[in-house]
């Protein structure tokens, strides 16, 4: 299996209506999430606009939500599932009201390392409400820590960052996730064939990283 070049991923462009200011044109990158046959399951979106003086996680999340509400998921990713990096502030805000949840996965970050058990538990109500509305939630490997046990049943996806742990820990992480959740596992930041083979042999079905596809650009009006 060989990696997929950026040019191999079809680019999409959502044309701005006549009279639309270029300041409202968002440059969004999408990176494919694929199965073992390199069939695209979905795309993770990233803000790549340069108009703003600075980017923060919150501003990037707001821009992506606005682009989705304006253009719709199909214009940005076709009929595939879209994965969006969120902040906890954006999850509690009104950005999600105009987005149809069926094809949207919200990537929820862990709290700061200093977060208490009570602070982690306090997020459950918001996360559960999003699931009730039809959104699926994705967490990274932090959700497998004991302190996040209350989040684990809410996971639709767990993303295992191949750059964040040693190869010998892959097996225990995959086994623990399979025993304690119903989540679909995604190996992300897969950059070598060895990393892919390691996770595929452990039963992981979805993959993301430069070994498969680099991000490609999508233009959308916000």
Predicted feature locations:
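EAL-family c-di-GMP phosphodiesterase catalytic domain
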Residues: 1-40, 48-52, 107-116, 140-144, ...
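N-terminal start-of-chain detector that recognizes signal peptides
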Residues: 13-20, 53-58, 76-80, 129-133
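Short, surface-exposed loop/strand segments
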Residues: 21-26, 43-46, 63-65, 69-71
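A short, charged/proline- and glycine-enriched loop
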Residues: 40-41, 102
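A short, polar/charged loop-to-alpha-helix boundary motif
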Residues: 49-66
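Catalytic core of bacterial c-di-GMP phosphodiesterases, primarily the EAL and HD-GYP domains
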Residues: 61-129, 135-140, 144-147
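Short, well-ordered coil/turn elements that cap or connect secondary structure elements
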Residues: 100-101, 132, 152, 180
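Surface-exposed amphipathic alpha-helices with a cationic face
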Residues: 123-134, 171-181
